[in-house]
Amino acid sequence: MLMKQVSAFLLVGIGGFLGSAARYGASLLLSPVAGGLPLATFSVNIIGCFFIGFISELALSTTLVSPESRLFLVTGFCGGFTTFSSYIFENASLLKDGQMLYTSAYLAGSVIGGFVALYSGTFFAKIWT
């Protein structure tokens, strides 16, 4: 059992490393052409959403994606590449389950909470320095 958990952590970690490296590569590639627009972030978020949807559907409806491959690709790679794709997938899952109130709260709470947390962090960093 312990070896299976260690293997899962390694799959997620290696996938996360590769996803993070791919995100960094996208920022190097797209930043010079964006002219101030956060094109790299926008692009990886949209690509990540497509990829997590594609892989998750294959994992659910076929035998093409093993549970280990799903851990590596979805949790690891997509997690390192973009957390936005996980956020959208979780909201879609809530919607699919008919949880409109939870979906609305999660969407609004994440966006509003994210802005509040960002500005709070900025505020406290300015006080601290």
Swiss-Prot record:
Top-rank taxon, per record: Bacteria
GO cellular component: plasma membrane
InterPro entries: FluC
Swiss-Prot/TrEMBL keywords: Cell inner membrane, Cell membrane, Ion channel, Ion transport, Membrane, Metal-binding, Sodium, Transmembrane, Transmembrane helix, Transport
Catalytic activity: fluoride(in) = fluoride(out)
Biological process per Gene Ontology, one example term: cellular detoxification of fluoride
Regulation (activators, inhibitors): Na(+) is not transported, but it plays an essential structural role and its presence is essential for fluoride channel function.
One GO MF term: metal ion binding
Parts forming coiled coils: none
Location of this chain's protein in the cell: Cell inner membrane
Stretches that traverse the bilayer: 1-21, 35-55, 71-91, 105-125
Membrane topology recorded in Swiss-Prot or TrEMBL: Multi-pass membrane protein
Pfam families hit by this protein: CRCB
Residues binding Na(+), per UniProt: G79, T82
PANTHER family cross-referenced by the UniProt entry: FLUORIDE EXPORT PROTEIN 1-RELATED
Primary role: Fluoride-specific ion channel. Important for reducing fluoride concentration in the cell, thus reducing its toxicity.
Family as reported in the entry's similarity comment: Belongs to the fluoride channel Fluc/FEX (TC 1.A.43) family.
Entries under HAMAP family matching the protein: FluC
Protein name: Fluoride-specific ion channel FluC
Record organism: Chlorobium phaeobacteroides (strain DSM 266 / SMG 266 / 2430)
Organism phylogeny: Bacteria, Pseudomonadati, Chlorobiota, Chlorobiia, Chlorobiales
